A protein has these predicted regions:
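Carbohydrate-recognition beta-sandwich/jelly-roll modules
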Residues: 1-9, 15-288
Length: 288
């Protein structure tokens, strides 16, 4: 089969910075909260290798005006001005990227909607709500067909005992297209494995499309295929019959990536290592 090709990376206009812990280093774009690459113990995993400038707010494409600030060795902050007058979007959002041990944390730490929106009160036009934020396209971690043993493993909700909700996909060139929601997602090479957690409450439908807080995408870059794990869309302000939801329903968007070498000492790296490491970033139900 013929090899696939895509747009090559042009980093001539990108300024990168580095944030790191004692074990993990992340190369980040100063113009957008995007990780280009991770390094752990001399081995690398790609993040989002192609430049990004847009996000989706209320399903409208916005090119935010971004101010970058490096807080310290481990942490960087992005102030993103979201403006789209004809669609009533007038908000500021702060995004923090932070490396903690072998994890990267992607956190929206503050959202200010300059429209008049009062929780529990009437709203005259629901378009004034900042209802959804979507960084789709911003792969939090990925693998490339150029890497030995590159694989994506994902799990969806399966209520049918005869049908597995699991996908095990080798990342090759060529390969089938992939754009699918998952509850759990891992990428691995023969050296490193990574898992991603998000507090997105996204659903692409019922059944196995439910609780799809992660989205996996294939992207062809140059001569290589990349499969990356993205957070699905986040919800923020909502209204029902013209009444804005109460404040307590709002949860600031958050995602975490964990990267590991062989974690179960079986002398190979695969999704199981990512799954073991994932326990350190998963959101445990209260009482567990």
């Amino acid at each position: 089969a013929e090899k696939e090709t895509g747009a090559v990376v042009d980093d001539s206009k990108v300024t990168y910075d580095t944030i790191q812990s004692k074990v993990l280093k992340a190369v980040i774009d100063q113009a957008f909260p995007r990780v280009k690459e991770y390094t752990l113990n001399g081995h690398t995993l790609p993040g989002q290798v192609q430049q990004l400038k847009k996000i989706l707010v209320n399903n409208h494409e916005i090119t935010p005006e971004v101010t970058y600030k490096k807080i310290n060795d481990t942490t960087a902050e992005y102030l993103m001005k979201l403006r789209d007058e004809k669609n009533f979007i007038n908000s500021d959002m702060t995004v923090r990227l932070q490396v903690v041990d072998n994890q990267l944390h992607f956190d929206v730490t503050k959202i200010v909607n300059h429209n008049q929106v009062t929780p529990g009160q009437k709203i005259d036009d629901e378009r004034k709500l900042l209802s959804s934020i979507n960084f789709l396209g911003n792969s939090l971690v990925s693998v490339s067909s150029d890497q030995a043993g590159a694989k994506f493993d994902g799990a969806t909700m399966s209520n049918n005992t005869h049908i597995s909700g699991d996908d095990h996909i080798a990342v090759t060139n060529p390969m089938k297209d992939l754009a699918k929601g998952y509850m759990y997602g891992f990428v691995s090479t023969d050296k490193l494995a990574a898992g991603v957690w998000s507090n997105s409450q996204n659903s692409y439908g019922g059944g196995s499309y439910d609780w799809t807080r992660l989205t996996a995408y294939k992207e062809t870059v140059g001569n290589a295929n990349y499969v990356g794990i993205h957070s699905s869309e986040w919800q923020w302000e909502k209204a029902y019959k013209g009444i804005v939801f109460p404040e307590y329903t709002k949860e600031l968007p958050s995602a975490k990536v964990v990267i590991t070498e062989d974690a179960n000492a079986d002398k190979k790296v695969d999704w199981q290592d990512g799954a073991i490491a994932y326990r350190s970033i998963m959101n445990n139900p209260q009482g567990w």
